[in-house]
């Protein structure tokens, strides 16, 4: 009888009788900054603005293939693997599980920036124990694969040769090694490292790996990073559910470089759209707050692949030279063209931008007129989508809206009213076409030249 009584005793059931079910509190939300084109939109600059009053700044995907330049007090800092918020002495920088880490690259980057004045970074950096490691042979393989592609197809992907793709390949084929493996039993790690190296050598006959030399270095790096490593899932959970905190997520690469949604195969090997934030940090979607898309006032692309609004002419040259369009990571000349709103709308469909940052508006100051790509035509017919297939994307014709240039210097503008009416019209046109407000307009290199509109 006692068993029945227990089962009828409503008080033993949470939520039964007079007891309220525990209400799930969402906790703090993260603010996300993502590239809305092919990268190099100026994400670092927006991060820098928001990082000054953030408590935690996170990276969730990619590796040191990203390049962010931040100018503080006249000093230019270059970040590849570090969140660019590492400059903020009051904030914690977190490298999430979705990031792939080349340890020599991490310390080289630290040294370079220390020489410029970065202090105590190791006290502010936390690394997820689940992040995968980029080995030197991954980088070598990256280069060898590119040579192979060039020989077989006469074209390459335009990789940064930082070993990112091969590392994500190891991760997907479940042979990769993580930070937690490096910090556990080193004999076990060494055995798995040797297997992984041999596996790559069997695929690439001319790949040389100094296994013992590498392991010696890795053992040294293990001790250097040990104090910085935490279980990333628990770290993020505490950050979200502890005291109120401002948490910023700095996306690397951009929407059209996303492994799923980008211009495949000319993409990177991770998700650089909003989904990568959840998988790369181990947080639920309800903790994603504002998502800011960063878009340049024109379009650039590094390496090969379709680029519908590209201008291989005087306009392209003006944008390239005025915009100093050279890659931070590769030093390669960027291809330039008109602003493409088909791409921007597509990026918004995937990411759900709550607002945009429109950067480098000042580069357009000298132009007599501007064109904005508003639709694609295929065989003379308007198509209502962004084509997935690269051969089709190569064939589209762009429908342009032509707008008169403002022909005046905007670099001194610090508020909306300082901008010429025609520049204001250009911005409003973008907002109305995409249906997302522009929150910042960039008219120069410094922090002060980001005009905040609301």
UniProtKB/Swiss-Prot annotation:
PROSITE patterns reported for this sequence: ADENYLOSUCCIN_SYN_1 (PS01266), ADENYLOSUCCIN_SYN_2 (PS00513)
* Magnesium is among the record's keywords: yes
Q: Which residues form the active site?
A: 40, 68
Binding residues annotated for IMP, in chain numbering: 40-43, 65-68, 160, 174, 253, 268, 332
Instruction: Give the keywords, sorted.
Output: Cytoplasm, GTP-binding, Ligase, Magnesium, Metal-binding, Nucleotide-binding, Purine biosynthesis
Annotated Gene Ontology cellular components are: cytoplasm
Note whether Repeat occurs among the keywords: no
Biological process (GO) annotations? 'de novo' AMP biosynthetic process; IMP metabolic process
Q: Which residues bind substrate?
A: 40, 328-334
Pathway it works in: Purine metabolism; AMP biosynthesis via de novo pathway; AMP from IMP: step 1/2
Task: List GO molecular-function terms, semicolon-separated.
Answer: adenylosuccinate synthase activity; GTP binding; magnesium ion binding
UniProt subcellular location: Cytoplasm
Instruction: Write out the catalysed reaction.
Output: IMP + L-aspartate + GTP = N(6)-(1,2-dicarboxyethyl)-AMP + GDP + phosphate + 2 H(+)
Q: What is its EC number?
A: 6.3.4.4
Q: Where does Mg(2+) bind?
A: 40, 67
Give all cystine bridges in this chain: none
Mind telling me which PANTHER family this protein's record contains? Answer: ADENYLOSUCCINATE SYNTHETASE (PTHR11846), ADENYLOSUCCINATE SYNTHETASE ISOZYME 1 (PTHR11846:SF2)
NCBIfam families, per database record: PRK01117.1, purA
Q: Its biological function?
A: Component of the purine nucleotide cycle (PNC), which interconverts IMP and AMP to regulate the nucleotide levels in various tissues, and which contributes to glycolysis and ammoniagenesis. Catalyzes the first committed step in the biosynthesis of AMP from IMP.
Which protein are we looking at?
A: Adenylosuccinate synthetase isozyme 1 A
What gene name is listed for this protein?
adss1-a
């Amino acid at each position: 009888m006692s068993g029945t009584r227990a089962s009828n005793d409503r008080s033993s059931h949470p939520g039964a009788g007079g007891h309220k079910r525990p209400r799930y509190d969402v906790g703090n939300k993260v603010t996300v900054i993502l590239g809305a084109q092919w990268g190099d939109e100026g994400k670092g600059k927006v991060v820098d603005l928001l990082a000054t009053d953030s408590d935690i700044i996170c990276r969730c995907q990619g590796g040191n293939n990203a390049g962010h330049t931040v100018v503080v007090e006249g000093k230019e800092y270059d970040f590849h693997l570090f969140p660019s918020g590492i400059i903020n002495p009051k904030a914690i920088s977190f490298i999430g599980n979705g990031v792939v880490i080349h340890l020599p690259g991490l310390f080289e980057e630290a040294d370079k920036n220390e020489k410029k004045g970065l202090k105590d970074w190791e006290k502010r950096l936390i690394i997820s124990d689940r992040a995968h490691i980029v080995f030197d042979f991954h980088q070598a393989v990256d280069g060898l694969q590119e040579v192979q592609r060039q020989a077989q197809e006469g074209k390459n992907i335009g990789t940064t040769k930082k070993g990112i793709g091969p590392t994500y390949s190891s991760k997907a084929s479940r042979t990769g090694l993580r930070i937690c493996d490096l910090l556990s039993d080193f004999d076990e790690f060494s055995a798995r490292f040797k297997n992984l190296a041999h596996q790559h050598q069997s695929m690439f006959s001319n790949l040389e790996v100094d296994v013992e030399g590498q392991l010696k270095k890795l053992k040294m790096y293990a001790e250097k990073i040990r104090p910085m490593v935490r279980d990333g899932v628990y770290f993020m959970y505490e950050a979200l559910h502890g005291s109120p905190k401002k948490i910023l997520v700095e996306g690397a690469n951009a929407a059209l470089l996303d492994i799923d949604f980008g211009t495949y195969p000319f993409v990177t090997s991770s998700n650089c759209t909003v989904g990568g934030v959840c998988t790369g940090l181990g947080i639920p979607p309800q903790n994603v707050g504002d998502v800011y898309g960063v878009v340049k006032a024109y379009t650039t692309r590094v390496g090969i692949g379709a680029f519908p609004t590209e201008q291989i002419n005087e306009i392209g040259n003006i944008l390239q030279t005025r915009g100093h369009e050279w890659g931070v990571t590769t030093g390669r000349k960027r291809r330039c063209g008109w602003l493409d709103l088909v791409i921007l709308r597509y990026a918004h469909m995937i990411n759900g931008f709550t607002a945009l940052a429109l950067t480098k508006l000042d580069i357009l100051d000298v132009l007599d007129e501007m064109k904005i790509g508003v639709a694609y035509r295929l065989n003379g017919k308007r198509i209502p989508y962004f084509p997935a297939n690269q051969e089709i994307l190569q064939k589209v014709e762009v429908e342009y809206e032509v707008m008169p240039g403002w022909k005046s210097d905007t670099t001194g503008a610090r508020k909306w009213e300082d901008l010429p009416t025609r520049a204001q019209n250009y911005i409003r046109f973008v907002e109305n076409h995409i249906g997302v407000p522009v929150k910042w307009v960039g008219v120069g290199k410094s922090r002060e030249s980001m005009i905040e509109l609301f």
